[in-house]
């Protein structure tokens, strides 16, 4: 098995992979002040919870948008697993043709998302990742990444609303029962949800209008589970791990 690690701005998600199948996942909060030993102990705990051991892990691959944390993770894997992990970045074969102004600016996580969507579902496909930011990336039928969009994630919007107002509280991000909110908490939850949902639906529609072609829409990321609207064809919470497994296979 291989260990796939997605280091994001808000969370680190660790996946135990058997080929392209995700055996188990483990989500922890991203903290730049954790030592490599602390991350190593978390990895061992995850393996134990997955009824696995370090001996079961043959290799590892990392996708990271937080360089400081990535370096700690690399050290932890070398020390606790005896593995120097593969890093998604320059020089790595992905099978994807990045046809954007600055290919190096495309985050490793988004590249893995696109690889996962294209290898699993084919193209053309619009990949939506709902995390700290909500991102959209369009992949054509030949596997070329042609366009990307970045906007505020719903969790980030909720945190900004609470921190920049005197009396509005922090609220849990959830799908509201109704848009007819009768108190402040429900009003915030419904407002945040439907504002974000409306943005997602309009953005998908705009892609269809400008591209004038049919394509699949695949959503992933921590918040995708609450936004399974009719315009989204597939919600795949392990999409990035499928992409990381695909990239790994091209480089061994």
UniProtKB/Swiss-Prot annotation:
**By its UniProt entry, which HAMAP family does this protein fall under?**
Pantothen_kinase_3
Active site annotated at which positions? Answer: 109 (proton acceptor)
Gene3D superfamilies from the entry?
A: 3.30.420.40
Oligomeric state and interaction partners are given as: Homodimer.
Which UniProt key words apply to this protein?
A: ATP-binding, Coenzyme A biosynthesis, Cytoplasm, Kinase, Metal-binding, Nucleotide-binding, Potassium, Transferase
What's this protein's name? Type III pantothenate kinase
Q: In which pathway does it act?
A: Cofactor biosynthesis; coenzyme A biosynthesis; CoA from (R)-pantothenate: step 1/5
Q: Which cofactor does it need?
A: NH4(+); K(+)
Query: What broad taxonomic lineage does this protein's source fall under?
Result: Bacteria, Bacillati, Actinomycetota, Actinomycetes, Bifidobacteriales
- Co-factor note (free text): A monovalent cation. Ammonium or potassium.
Which cellular component terms (GO) are annotated to the entry? cytoplasm
One GO molecular function term? Answer: metal ion binding
What species is this protein from?
Answer: Bifidobacterium animalis subsp. lactis (strain AD011)
Underlying gene: coaX
């Amino acid at each position: 098995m291989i260990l796939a690690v997605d280091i994001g701005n808000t969370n680190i998600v660790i996946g135990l992979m058997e080929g392209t199948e995700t055996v188990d996942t483990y989500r922890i909060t991203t903290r730049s002040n954790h030592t490599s030993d602390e991350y190593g102990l978390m990895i061992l705990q995850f393996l134990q919870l997955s009824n696995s051991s370090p001996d079961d892990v043959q290799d590892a691959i990392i996708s990271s948008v937080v360089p400081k944390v990535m370096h700690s993770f690399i050290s932890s894997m070398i020390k606790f697993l005896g593995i120097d992990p593969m890093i998604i970045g320059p020089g790595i074969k992905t099978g994807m043709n990045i046809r954007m102004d600055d290919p190096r600016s495309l985050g490793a996580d988004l590249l893995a998302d696109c690889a996962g969507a294209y290898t699993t579902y084919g193209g053309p496909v619009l990949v939506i990742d709902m995390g700290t930011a909500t991102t959209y990336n369009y992949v054509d039928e030949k596997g070329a990444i042609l366009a990307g969009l970045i906007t505020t994630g719903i969790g980030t919007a909720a945190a900004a609303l609470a921190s920049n107002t005197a009396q509005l509280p922090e609220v849990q991000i959830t799908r509201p029962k109704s848009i007819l909110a009768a108190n402040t908490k429900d009003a915030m939850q419904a407002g945040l949800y439907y504002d974000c949902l409306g943005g997602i639906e309009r953005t998908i529609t705009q892609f269809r209008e400008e591209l004038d072609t049919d394509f699949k829409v695949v959503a992933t990321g921590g918040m995708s589970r609450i936004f399974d609207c009719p315009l989204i064809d597939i919600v795949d919470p392990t999409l990035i791990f499928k992409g990381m497994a695909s990239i790994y296979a091209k480089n061994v």
